[in-house]
Amino acid sequence: MSATLTGSGTALGFSCSSKISKRVSSSPSTRCSIKMSVSVDEKKKSFTLQKSEEAFNAAKNLMPGGVNSPVRAFKSVGGQPVLIDSVKGSKMWDIDGNEYIDYVGSWGPAIIGHADDEVLAALAETMKKGTSFGAPCLLENVLAEMVISAVPSIEMVRFVNSGTEACMGVLRLARAFTNKEKFIKFEGCYHGHANAFLVKAGSGVATLGLPDSPGVPKAATSDTLTAPYNDIEAVAKLFEAHKGEISAVILEPVVGNSGFITPTPEFINGLRQLTKDNGALLIFDEVMTGFRLAYGGAQEYFGITPDLTTLGKIIGGGLPVGAYGGRRDIMEMVAPAGPMYQAGTLSGNPLAMTAGIHTLKRLKQPGTYEYLDKITKELTNGILEAGKKTGHPMCGGYISGMFGFFFAEGPVYNFADAKKSDTEKFGKFFRGMLEEGVYFAPSQFEAGFTSLAHTSEDIQFTISAAERVLGRI
């Protein structure tokens, strides 16, 4: 089931060719369970961010804005950014000693929980042999075979170091293979910070209130065409207006960088047909959705096979990683097999490969995605019901271990709809939940994530906290 974004207080689904079972199973036996160590009253009395404030003020003299990625500065939600000291399971602890149930999960990679014992042990063994070789290693073969066997579209894969790198490489490859330069992306979809993609790019720029980024030459985006998400007619018009010039259509199959937005069946099926009819490639950016919506990603979930796919986050188990892959005839254009050049000093490094291998092994265990679906449904519906009880218009949805909610009536089908959300109210909600010991993404325009480490106790605590906070707003 795919949950649409409605204002009804429930997550309603539309039918699709999903391979996900809706059966509810018990949680995998290996998931981490960490008890809340203090009561709600004790937590609120002890909550302070003094050390975080001091460290952040010092950081602002050392790094632009005090951070190394803009959303971490809390610009769109206000308040004091927290500096994290340690993580384990579903929890994080800041340098002031505050404990949080975490629904960011390092922005997606921590699907089996933070600092998993098996992953840490495997990394320790790998590090005894070295941290980087700058040469091929057997671990690359192992992870490549796992990715190829899991993701329907991938017959060959190239590992890189980030989602941005993956999207840069896949766009260059699409242009090389088709010998066309224009491509279509969607408003609110984020594909990294390469120049060609920084047009109506979703959360990365929405957080700062900017439509794009200074420093991006007009020439770099002259071949970037944009359309509203879920608007297949707009895409058809672009193909008509630029006949024979469009190399590819790239999208987040479920948007995570405008908040959480799902595709309509007409839209996602229509894209597959339009690209085939016009000699263009369909690219799924599955940096967020890969191995999260299903073991085979969004393409398995929806039953739509693109020509090329980008991956990241989960396949590195929390270490820097990215990948792009697809049909063999396309991938054989990548150097050194073919003329399309792309390289990387740390690509395929043994640490990221190790963490990825052990993360995917865990995800392949029976009951994994049924458990994620169960707890995420409970969480999302609980938060929406809390909004209903306290008189706050909200809408939201979920698929497997990915979810989102907006302070808006809904429904939300695209970035224009998402921007109608009450961001001031979201900021109040975010800050209130932080004091309650719950860490959501510090932006209305970001999806949230659950993990195998989240327990029913975590979910119930979060729902109760949401009702308390919403009751005070």
From Swiss-Prot:
UniProt-listed Pfam families: Aminotran_3 (PF00202)
Instruction: List residues modified as N6-(pyridoxal phosphate)lysine.
Output: K313
The portions of this protein that span the membrane are: none
For whether the record's keyword set contains Plastid, the answer is yes
Q: What is its EC number?
A: 5.4.3.8
Subcellular localization is given as: Plastid, Chloroplast
Question: Which keywords belong to this entry?
Answer: Chlorophyll biosynthesis, Chloroplast, Isomerase, Plastid, Porphyrin biosynthesis, Pyridoxal phosphate, Transit peptide
Q: Which GO terms describe its molecular function?
A: glutamate-1-semialdehyde 2,1-aminomutase activity; pyridoxal phosphate binding; transaminase activity
- Catalytic function, reaction form: (S)-4-amino-5-oxopentanoate = 5-aminolevulinate
Task: Please list the cofactors this protein needs.
Answer: pyridoxal 5'-phosphate
Xref: PROSITE patterns? AA_TRANSFER_CLASS_3
Query: Entry's InterPro entries?
Result: 4pyrrol_synth_GluAld_NH2Trfase, Aminotrans_3, Aminotrans_3_PPA_site, PyrdxlP-dep_Trfase, PyrdxlP-dep_Trfase_major, PyrdxlP-dep_Trfase_small
Biological process (GO) annotations?
Answer: chlorophyll biosynthetic process; protoporphyrinogen IX biosynthetic process
Pathway(s) it belongs to: Porphyrin-containing compound metabolism; protoporphyrin-IX biosynthesis; 5-aminolevulinate from L-glutamyl-tRNA(Glu): step 2/2; Porphyrin-containing compound metabolism; chlorophyll biosynthesis
Protein origin, superkingdom: Eukaryota
One cellular component GO annotation, for this chain's record? Answer: chloroplast
Transit peptide feature, positions: 1-37
Coiled-coil spans in chain? none
On whether Glycosyltransferase is a keyword of this UniProt record, the answer is no
Which enzyme class? isomerase
Q: Which family does it belong to?
A: Belongs to the class-III pyridoxal-phosphate-dependent aminotransferase family. HemL subfamily.
Q: Which PANTHER family match?
A: GLUTAMATE-1-SEMIALDEHYDE 2,1-AMINOMUTASE (PTHR43713), GLUTAMATE-1-SEMIALDEHYDE 2,1-AMINOMUTASE 1, CHLOROPLASTIC-RELATED (PTHR43713:SF3)
Outline the subunit composition: Homodimer.
* Protein name listed in UniProt: Glutamate-1-semialdehyde 2,1-aminomutase, chloroplastic
| Organism encoding this protein | Brassica napus
